[in-house]
Amino acid sequence: MVKPIVFMIAIVMVGVIFFVLVIPAEDQLMDSWVSTGPNITLDEWREVFRLWAQFGIAVALVAALFWFLCGQWIFGMTRWIKANNKRWVWLGFLLVAVLAVVPGMVLTPAVQEWGRLAWVCYVVNNLGLFYLATLLFSPSSFKYVPWLAMRVRYW
């Protein structure tokens, strides 16, 4: 019973790494590349960027935790051959993480230069967090469901 709790803590730690390290690094990148217009200052724009980046990471983290909870305690495993059928569920949670990018894309104010770089950051954050968390810490019964997990995961 200890291993699932450790895996859930590890998933949360991946999310914390994204909150603590990735968003500030992207914020500095935006500070040096993005050029705003007369309607909004760079500090206001960066504040909006950080808000929507944090929102996307939170949604991706919740999706990864729900995948773990479903795989560990909800899905019944009677045949190992049928474990790969849950890939559609994993793809559904991945879709939730991807769709969390949309509010940031729509509600981040337009800027004069390099504004679309925020979109790239939103997508990389959400996909990176969800994929890494599920690749490394999926439940044992479904640990090979994420793509390329057979090449990475040996525990």
Where are these regions (language model features)?
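N-terminal signal-anchor transmembrane alpha-helix
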Residues: 1-62
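Membrane-water interface at transmembrane helix exits
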Residues: 19-30, 66, 70-75, 108, ...
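Hydrophobic alpha-helical transmembrane segments of integral membrane proteins
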Residues: 80-115
